[in-house]
């Protein structure tokens, strides 16, 4: 199975995984491969390495997809290959900008949008708060899903845990959608009466804990949002529908080390429980088994290959045999947990993965070329 | 390692995802415990040990969860009936968990509490050192700023007061140290340098006390030796699969070691004596024995 097979019939590919496993590079390599297959592809990256961005021909942060130039594409194509038949577009997510644009879109008037953007709570929310990257990444995906692309490849923000990508946007949406909070802030709200709690003592207790200013800031913020909270809620539901749709595919990216594999197994389970569509996994940087049948190996001899070099080589192979064994065991664990779902293996490569040559090499592994 | 690091009360360990923050945090904890300091390694994932559990003599572990941190806070901080009312109110829980930054503040509050000699948790013993296995750099830097941000936003009231106290602790360089973990790869090094710059800005600038270069690949072959291996590979006929793949593995490792040397050089130029290096462990898994080997490298 190759990455092309995994993505058959899908319009959205979301690369998820623990930090440091190569999500961005994988997303870029998939974009290249699908563009070679004639698709119009947009890759949404989050904070890529500068040289990776340069390899894609992206010189600066831009919050809209930019078409990769012919010159950059030439570097991403092997000399013996025909030019790309599809189109490759790429962008780097700017969370703050995406958030501002969302407010612009949903505000009843430009004045209201400007007021919201000046609000202290909003400024915190849109830049400093954990989860704003996740929230805006999905927002951007939703926006681009309306555009005329055959495939969107989303790289997800760095997080300790892959599940953060599923949880964080919901937390922010719930906040923006008001819900419990609004009931709380509207002193005579129906919710209070239903709960049988007098509003006054609860608000008094809340003031005691939060300080009055925080409460009044929040009240001001929700006052500004007004009817937009309903829009946020409706939007959050549509985004959930999009993520669950059978046009979408979550692609798990992992390395073959213990913790990322554990995380991958667990994340697969989480996706299953939430009814999220799953395409398979990519295991990066796999150490291939090294045959050490005859030790020492039947190496060249002579002055160019002194005995101490042979000894070093053997130590190197012994160490690698440990890693190869570890990787094989971990991949087996993954296979058991996946019960037949596709797993693509990308070996540890000698080339630097952050430049055009590296991207091309990874793309070849993923697409069986 | 300089004994200075271990004289702090709170060590924040952060760095890019996948560089081995947890491993390094535990190794630091083991090293401190071995030096006789009662130490706890805490993360804020809320998914591990929910109670303070002893991992090795003098070394404890805790996973801080914002919900229980909040319950604890209300229990201790809010007087009588108000606390009762708030604890029972699902609305309040929803409010607290949905308010941006509140989860982080509650976690920071708990970490701060762990580092106090006078613990507010009933019957809890004091720790000499709290090592925080913090989230990845971007989020890690944001979390360090949360108390200050809250203190500025809330201004008055118990939360503001608590946030001010925590913020003061964090900016006290005698009390708090921030340590970055990196590998000798381009992105982690970039992120370490960005973290240094991000910490240095804002109302409460912080400095990286140490940078730990984790999992440094060995420099096994000289350039001349690598050429000899490449030449041997070129001469070896294709069917000799074993020999060819063995030679290729060696060349791949050499290329990686060369790339790492260049990245290690960037860290060394930026951090000089504050840079500490831990070797790559060719082991099936990193368990207590492996952690002890790393701890020995970090011992004061």
For each predicted feature, which ranges?
Chain B
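Conserved catalytic-core segment of NTP-binding enzymes
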Residues: 2-4, 19, 23-27, 34-35, ...
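P-loop (Walker A) phosphate-binding loop of NTP-binding proteins
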Residues: 16
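N-terminal phosphate/diphosphate-binding loop that engages ATP/GTP or pyrophosphate donors
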Residues: 30-90
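Flexible beta-alpha connector loops of hexameric P-loop NTPases
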Residues: 67-76, 94-103, 150-158
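Short, surface-exposed amphipathic charged segments that create phosphate/polyanion-binding patches used
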Residues: 73-81, 223-230, 289-298
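ATP-hydrolysis module of ASCE/P-loop NTPase motor domains
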Residues: 80-115
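NTP-binding/hydrolysis catalytic cores, primarily Walker-type P-loop NTPases
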Residues: 270-300
């Amino acid at each position: 199975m190759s990455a092309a097979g995994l993505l058959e019939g899908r319009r959205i590919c979301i690369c998820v995984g623990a930090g440091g496993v190569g999500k961005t590079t994988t997303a870029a390599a998939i974009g290249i491969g699908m563009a070679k297959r004639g698709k119009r592809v947009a890759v949404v990256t989050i904070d890529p390495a500068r040289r990776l961005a340069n390899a894609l021909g992206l010189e600066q942060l831009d919050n809209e997809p930019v078409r990769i130039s012919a010159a950059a594409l030439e570097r991403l194509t092997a000399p013996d290959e025909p030019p790309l038949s599809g189109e490759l577009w790429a962008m780097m997510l700017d969370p703050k900008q995406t958030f501002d644009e969302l407010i612009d879109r949903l505000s009843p008037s430009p004045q209201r949008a400007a007021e919201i953007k000046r609000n202290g709570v909003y400024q915190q929310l849109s830049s400093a708060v954990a989860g704003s990257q996740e929230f805006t990444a999905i927002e951007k995906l939703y926006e681009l899903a309306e555009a005329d692309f055959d495939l969107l490849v989303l790289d997800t923000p760095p997080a300790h845990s892959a599940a953060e990508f599923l949880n964080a946007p919901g937390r922010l949406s719930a906040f923006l959608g008001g819900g419990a909070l609004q009931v709380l802030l509207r002193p005579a709200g129906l919710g209070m009466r239903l709960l049988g709690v007098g509003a006054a003592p609860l608000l008094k207790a809340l003031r005691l804990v939060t300080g009055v200013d925080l409460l009044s800031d929040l009240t001001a913020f929700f006052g500004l949002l007004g009817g937009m909270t309903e829009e946020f809620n409706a939007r959050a539901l549509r985004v959930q529908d999009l993520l669950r749709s059978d046009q979408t595919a979550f692609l798990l990216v992992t390395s073959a080390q213990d913790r990322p594999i554990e995380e991958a197994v667990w994340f697969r389970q989480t996706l299953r429980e939430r009814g999220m569509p799953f395409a398979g996994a990519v295991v990066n940087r796999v150490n291939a088994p090294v045959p050490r049948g005859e030790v020492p190996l039947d190496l060249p001899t002579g002055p160019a290959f002194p005995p101490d070099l042979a000894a070093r080589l053997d130590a190197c192979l012994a160490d690698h045999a440990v890693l190869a064994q570890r990787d094989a065991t971990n991949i087996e664990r993954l296979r058991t947990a996946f019960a037949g779902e596709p797993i693509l293996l990308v070996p540890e490569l000698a080339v630097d993965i952050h430049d055009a040559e590296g991207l091309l090499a990874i793309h070849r592994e993923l697409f069986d070329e | 390692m300089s004994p200075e690091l271990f004289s702090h009360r709170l060590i924040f360990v952060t760095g890019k995802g996948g560089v081995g923050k947890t491993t390094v945090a535990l190794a630091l904890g083991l090293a401190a415990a071995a030096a006789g300091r009662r130490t706890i390694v805490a993360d804020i994932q809320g998914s591990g040990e929910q109670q303070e559990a002893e991992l090795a003599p003098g070394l404890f572990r805790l996973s801080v969860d914002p919900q229980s941190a909040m319950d604890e806070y209300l229990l201790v901080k809010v007087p009588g009936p108000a606390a009762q009312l708030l604890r029972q109110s699902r609305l309040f829980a929803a409010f607290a968990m949905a308010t941006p930054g509140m989860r982080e503040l509650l976690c920071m509050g708990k970490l701060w509490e762990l580092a106090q000699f006078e613990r507010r948790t009933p019957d809890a013993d004091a720790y000499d050192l709290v090592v925080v296995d913090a989230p990845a750099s971007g989020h890690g830097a944001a979390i360090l700023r949360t108390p200050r941000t809250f203190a500025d936003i809330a201004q008055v009231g118990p939360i503001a007061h608590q946030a001010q106290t925590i913020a003061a602790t964090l900016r006290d360089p005698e009390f708090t140290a921030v340590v970055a973990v990196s590998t000798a790869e381009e992105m982690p090094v970039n992120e370490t340098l960005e973290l240094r710059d991000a910490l240095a800005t804002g109302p409460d600038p912080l400095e990286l006390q140490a940078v730990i270069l984790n999992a440094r690949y060995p420099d096994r072959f000289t350039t001349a030796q690598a050429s000899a291996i490449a030449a041997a590979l070129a001469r070896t006929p294709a069917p000799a699969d074993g020999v060819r793949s063995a030679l290729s593995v060696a060349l791949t490792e050499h290329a990686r070691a060369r790339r790492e040397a260049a990245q290690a050089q960037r860290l060394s130029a930026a951090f000089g004596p504050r840079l500490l290096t831990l070797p790559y462990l060719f082991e099936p898994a990193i368990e207590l024995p492996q952690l002890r080997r790393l701890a020995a490298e970090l011992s004061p």
